[in-house]
């Protein structure tokens, strides 16, 4: 696993913000100070794990780091930050927007609501505040998504199965709330917030309003 992480870190360093780079196994081997055969095996493993996508363009190997590969790096970053006692509070800034209108349905389900009360200590307003993150705060959002959070267990009712949810402590203008992520979800540039209060009304928010969320990756906020 150590070589996997080092390879991802090396590829990311070479790829930059676009997460894509043309690189041969020989070039990766030189960067990692390993044999070309080892580098080739690592690339195959990264591809098999879904951490990267490999394609050939003009006879050159192009490697793109996938979201799951980035998640590995962000989890490692969170762990190192915790060990070194860096601040565990992160600022998120984004624009309020409409969701799909499903928040009320899910938040009101007894299987979720009972756990919100027991594990989060809140009886949430039946709905979510949807926020589209500004580009310069995407790294912070990814860090939050890849921290442990408080786990809300999935459940079944007579009609269907409901998946687990991770909740992360946050505050908006001093109001206690939680950022929520479905357990099986890919990274998106939007996130949802739940609170005991109807945040749109409490904070007089309209679509497009820029809002600041102070979030925690260790649950202490």
Curated annotation (Swiss-Prot):
Family to which the UniProt record says this protein belongs: Belongs to the archaeal riboflavin kinase family.
Binding-site positions, Mg(2+): 128, 130
UniProt name for this protein: Riboflavin kinase
Pfam family, one: CTP-dep_RFKase
Residue numbers binding CDP: 99-104, 197-200
Function: Catalyzes the CTP-dependent phosphorylation of riboflavin (vitamin B2) to form flavin mononucleotide (FMN).
Binding site for FMN: 185, 192
Cofactor binding, note field: Binds 1 Mg(2+) ion per subunit.
Native source organism of the sequence: Picrophilus torridus (strain ATCC 700027 / DSM 9790 / JCM 10055 / NBRC 100828 / KAW 2/3)
InterPro entries reported for this sequence: RibK_CTP-dep, Riboflavin_kinase_CTP-dep, Riboflavin_kinase_dom_sf, WH-like_DNA-bd_sf, WH_DNA-bd_sf
Top EC group: transferase
Pathway note: Cofactor biosynthesis; FMN biosynthesis; FMN from riboflavin (CTP route): step 1/1
PANTHER family registered for this protein in UniProt: RIBOFLAVIN KINASE
Gene3D superfamilies: Riboflavin kinase-like (2.40.30.30), Winged helix-like DNA-binding domain superfamily/Winged helix DNA-binding domain (1.10.10.10)
